């Protein structure tokens, strides 16, 4: 999560609903899953929320790190929240009110036509998991995942680790038993669902930025790399 001391708001992302891949047993938007919650720093009361993926059927939780930045948008300085979401879309929100300001894909996605004026996804038909398997991008791992992104006020660019990939999503009926894995399906990659990963510096990890220096990033093997910031 992130904290704005001026607004005294804590911003926290939430996980996906369960079962992950069988949405038939949990109708509706499934609030407040796959959302960012703005919580009062003193009381914990919710000031506002924004749901990235209503009725998520692909395990695209919203546990990415929200980046807080003051940006110029349409000639006006806005207190913004920048969020590259696991569902493959990038969002800019007003962090005071939760208003959706803009959004667009940053990774390969085939499940939505785009976002409406309120930031709600316009779903494509026949993209829900099925018994036979439904080919959808991004994969369950998402267009990005847990790794921290970064924002440079010098270049006005967001730096994020991104994946391009697609998978077959399967659904099945499953009874809930306390303590058991409750997924209601699964995913598969292979010849029919090539798991293509695109990244400039593999494998991914957090990204850190200095005021004028390069974007510094690590990998799961303990190596550290640096990439020049380009405007």
Name each model-derived stretch.
Residues 2-231:
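Beta-sheet-rich non-transmembrane sensory/scaffold domains
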């Amino acid at each position: 999560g992130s904290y704005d001391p001026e607004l005294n708001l804590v911003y926290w992302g939430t996980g996906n609903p369960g079962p992950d891949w069988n949405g038939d047993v949990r109708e509706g938007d499934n609030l407040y899953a796959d959302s960012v919650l703005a919580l009062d720093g003193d009381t914990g009361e919710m000031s506002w929320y924004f749901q990235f993926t209503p009725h998520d059927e692909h395990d695209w939780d919203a546990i990415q790190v929200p980046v807080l930045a003051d940006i110029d948008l349409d000639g006006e300085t806005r207190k913004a929240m920048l969020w590259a979401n696991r569902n493959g879309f990038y969002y800019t929100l007003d962090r005071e009110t939760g208003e959706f300001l803009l959004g667009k894909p940053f990774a390969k996605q085939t499940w939505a036509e785009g976002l409406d004026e309120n930031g709600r996804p316009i779903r494509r038909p026949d993209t829900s998991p099925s018994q036979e398997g439904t080919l959808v991008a991004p994969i369950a791992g998402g267009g990005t995942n847990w790794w921290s992104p970064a924002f440079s006020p010098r270049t006005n660019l967001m730096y994020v680790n991104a994946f391009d990939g697609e998978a077959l999503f399967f659904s099945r009926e499953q009874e809930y038993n306390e303590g058991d894995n409750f997924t209601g399906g699964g995913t598969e990659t292979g010849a029919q669902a090539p798991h293509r990963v695109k990244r400039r510096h593999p494998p991914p990890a957090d990204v850190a930025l200095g005021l004028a220096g390069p974007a510094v990033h690590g990998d799961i093997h303990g190596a550290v790399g640096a990439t020049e910031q380009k405007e």
